[in-house]
């Protein structure tokens, strides 16, 4: 009985450890990267952070999402592979926020609805537009061989 229990436990542990997603070919080592997003010290939760390589195309999704503390851990995603960290290199950084529209904005029969939606979004946006635009963002991050951190105070861009 003990032998069976040992082998069953060994098999379960091996299955969990040995079944990790393998990195895609050509993926360089990943470096730990954290981004803190706040508005004059007040953490901003649920802010998406995206990283665009300044040279070439990564071929992978590079992003993160802030928690209640305003901190996002950068992740590299390629197919079913998903791991914390970014490959070394230089990146432009953009932010995005999800704003829930109330049900009354779901009336597509109203010809003025698109304009009303845009007005609502503009009134409820907390991020400066420049930080959301990949072509205009002033936010940059260089990831070297050691852990990288970026502190973004959005109040500086309002």
Explain the meaning of each model-derived region.
Residues 15-18:
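C-terminal motif of bacterial Sec signal peptides marking the signal peptidase cleavage site
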Residues 1-8:
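Bacterial N-terminal signal peptides that target proteins for export
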């Amino acid at each position: 009985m003990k032998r069976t229990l040992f082998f069953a436990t060994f098999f379960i542990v091996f299955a969990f450890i040995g079944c990790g997603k393998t990195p895609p070919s050509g993926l360089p080592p990943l470096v730990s990267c954290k981004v803190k997003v706040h508005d004059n010290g007040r953490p901003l939760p649920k802010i998406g952070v995206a990283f665009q390589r300044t040279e070439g195309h990564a071929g992978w999704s590079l992003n993160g999402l802030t928690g209640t503390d305003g901190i996002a851990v950068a992740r590299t995603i390629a197919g079913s592979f998903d791991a914390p960290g970014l490959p070394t290199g230089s990146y432009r950084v953009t932010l995005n926020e999800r704003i829930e529209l109330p049900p009354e904005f779901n009336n597509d029969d109203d010809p003025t609805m698109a304009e009303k939606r845009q007005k609502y979004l503009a009134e409820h946006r907390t991020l400066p537009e420049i930080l959301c635009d990949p072509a205009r963002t002033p936010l940059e991050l260089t990831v070297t061989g050691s852990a990288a951190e970026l502190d973004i105070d959005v109040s500086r861009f309002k």
